Amino acid sequence: DDISNFPVIETRMEGQNLKYFSALINVDKVDGFTLSGNGKVDGNGERYWKSFWLRRRVIPKCTNMDELRPRLLHISHSNNVQVSDVRLVNSPFWTTHIYKCDSVKLLNLHIFSPSFPIKAPSTDAIDIDACKNVLVKGCYMSVNDDAIALKGGKGPWADQDPDNGGNCDIIIEDCTFGFCHGVLTCGSESIYNHNIILRRCNLDQAKRLLWLKMRPDTPQQYKYILVEDIKGNVRNCIFIAPWTQFYDLKDRKDMLVSYSSYITMRNIHLDCDSFFAVEKSKQYKLSNFCFDNLTITAKKDVKIDENIIDALVMRKVEINKVN
């Protein structure tokens, strides 16, 4: 748990290529890499978590990277990768980060970091960063941040930087999600996500099922996302709002407009606090959403504001308000 044991290398963090600390396990340009077995990789993150929250008390605007800490597993520029049957726990920072990879299978993993009594900050279970053809199957995830986060770059010129990129052809299926901030999250450093499927999953105590972080300083397109066959309980079913943390337009003068379109949610049976937590904004446009065969109980936000989404289609949507 001593950061001085981790070398500073050229790596990828928070939507930018830079010098930062290596992960505990680092894989770069290794096609066919496999990590498997019934063992456990324990990041021993408690000391880092305590230090992070102490720093945040003294310097409230400190960034996630200001508290120097390593990730658990980082795989980059590698194809035909498989990680299976491993327990990845107590990461100091992001747990599993894949960058610029093609054909990745993450199978039957158990990924955990605590939300109590010490919150493990920024311990995303799986960060998919400018990748394609990724399968996440049969995994259990419970972390004090997002479970599946789709990343790819941030900033007003992010879509013109060759180090960045979109995520496409991603399947997450047959997984169980415990506590997490978002089951499937687009952002916050993300530019283009398309052909994304989340299906046949169970939720228990997650904060959000689908979270679209609309960053006003980054051009973003989230399209062709399918969420289907979901059961359990969640605080918010669909959550869309501007994400302004560390907002920086740099030298760009025009207002960026982002887009989320062709989003389908179907065959979903959930108990939640809020169903439709969608904020209207001039900085993004929402269109071609489809809600199909939904059975929801919710404490609030049971009314779907059809003025927020262009070309919204609803079929067999049952939302019952409960106290």
Ranges and model annotations:
Residues 1-323:
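Extracellular/periplasmic carbohydrate-active domains that bind, remodel
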